[in-house]
Amino acid sequence: MESALPAAGFLYWVGAGTVAYLALRISYSLFTALRVWGVGNEAGVGPGLGEWAVVTGSTDGIGKSYAEELAKHGMKVVLISRSKDKLDQVSSEIKEKFKVETRTIAVDFASEDIYDKIKTGLAGLEIGILVNNVGMSYEYPEYFLDVPDLDNVIKKMININILSVCKMTQLVLPGMVERSKGAILNISSGSGMLPVPLLTIYSATKTFVDFFSQCLHEEYRSKGVFVQSVLPYFVATKLAKIRKPTLDKPSPETFVKSAIKTVGLQSRTNGYLIHALMGSIISNLPSWIYLKIVMNMNKSTRAHYLKKTKKN
């Protein structure tokens, strides 16, 4: 009986310690969530980082919304996309609405010989924020060997989703390091957090963006440069082929308004509270369950697409 008493006391303290630890973890998580998703860090985004923001893929969707949001915060904006007509239109809209200076650079990120032109266009600018947003995905989920025009898709997706991030960072980062301030926001994807079969190349390129961002943040945060990996799930954009926004599929404007608050607070973010909850749940699923669910979903989407195109 006497020997059982110390054991009971030990178990009591183990239990009490566990409860206290869990309570602290929950309290910290709630505090962090309130700080990020409630209060945010909008005040840290603006000309204080540098006069200019540079946004790639800036004529539609998330990129356009970032350009507008940064202009709203008083930053001059360089818009970089493929279509000169669209660039001129968005540039005019931003100038008129936010009363800030804009510049445009028309290039196709599928090409590799564009970066001298971009370098010339950015010369002499004090760049505080770079948003690497330009990207491409699949037309529809497909098995790797059956992707139409596979050779071209491989080249384009690497150039647009990977090379652009590296080269734009190479152009802009030195000025930020020299001034000891700046932020690079790399738009990855929820598809980059875990493997997505039938979107294999896209998923892999977005994983690159995520890892590149995390590594770069560790390398340069001591030099005053904040690098963020943004991992959205579905947003109602042309790229995602979603027309109507919902709670879990927000408009680009809603998503960016939320994501901009996380700059300086989260170096890796889903950008939007509902997406953060989705990411937490998905990341904690056993991998075999997750892969089975995603494979079945994408097989269903593939079958629907092929049936629809066959009818047409």
Swiss-Prot record:
Gene symbol here is HSD17B12
Q: Where in the sequence is the active site?
A: 202 (proton acceptor)
Task: Tell me the Gene Ontology biological-process terms attached to this UniProt entry.
Answer: estrogen biosynthetic process; extracellular matrix organization; fatty acid elongation, saturated fatty acid; long-chain fatty-acyl-CoA biosynthetic process; positive regulation of cell-substrate adhesion
Please give the InterPro entries that the UniProt record associates with this protein: NAD(P)-bd_dom_sf, Sc_DH/Rdtase_CS, SDR_fam, VLCFA-Steroid_DH
Q: Does the keyword Membrane apply?
A: yes
Q: Keyword Plastid on this protein?
A: no
Q: In which pathway does it act?
A: Lipid metabolism; fatty acid biosynthesis; Steroid biosynthesis; estrogen biosynthesis
Among SUPFAM superfamilies, the record links this protein to: NAD(P)-binding Rossmann-fold domains (SSF51735)
UniProt xrefs under PANTHER family? RH59310P, VERY-LONG-CHAIN 3-OXOACYL-COA REDUCTASE
**Comment block on domains:** The di-lysine motif confers endoplasmic reticulum localization for type I membrane proteins.
State any GO CC term. fatty acid elongase complex
Describe the family membership recorded for this protein in Swiss-Prot or TrEMBL.
Belongs to the short-chain dehydrogenases/reductases (SDR) family. 17-beta-HSD 3 subfamily.
Q: What is this protein called?
A: Very-long-chain 3-oxoacyl-CoA reductase
